[in-house]
Amino acid sequence: TLGNGSGGTAGVATNYSLVGGTYQMTVTQRPVTISGSRFYDSTTTVNGSDISAFTNTAGGQTLSITGSGTVATAIAGSNKTVALGTLTLADGTGSASNYSLASGSFDINSRQVNIAGSRIYDGTTTVNGSDLVITTGVGSEVLTVNGTGSTANANVANNKSVTAGTLALASASGNASNYSMGTITLT
């Protein structure tokens, strides 16, 4: 059945007729974009398991993804463009063959580090950055702490909470901007 066209050059359906026969139509793959995030790990790799969202699927269909891609830098940041590499769509509730992988964006979140340290009793509540040690858990990356914090009292105790005050992460062999401070304890 023909219908009237629209716009400035629209045709009127009654001016045309369809001749019997077989008509063909091409259905193309629907492009989808991906997004996801992970915590800083010093690599530029984006694994399929890091992808959490697919945009532009039809009728709420779901897909999954395998393989890996990359981002330009390993530094923590938002909306990084994903080079698709070997990332491949796989079936979910929708058939992957109906879709094409168009592009992706990715966030690398700063990794939270816990900070611990010890010092000899000195009668004060002040905690110096030099009293503290950070284990990043990322390769051989090392951070230091600058500034001062404080404890609730000067008494000797294990696992005392430290209020951050002016304590701040500083780069040593790791980039401090890839990390955020978690709990700080002093023994």
Model regions and ranges:
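Short loop/turn motifs that initiate or flank beta-strands
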Residues: 1-187
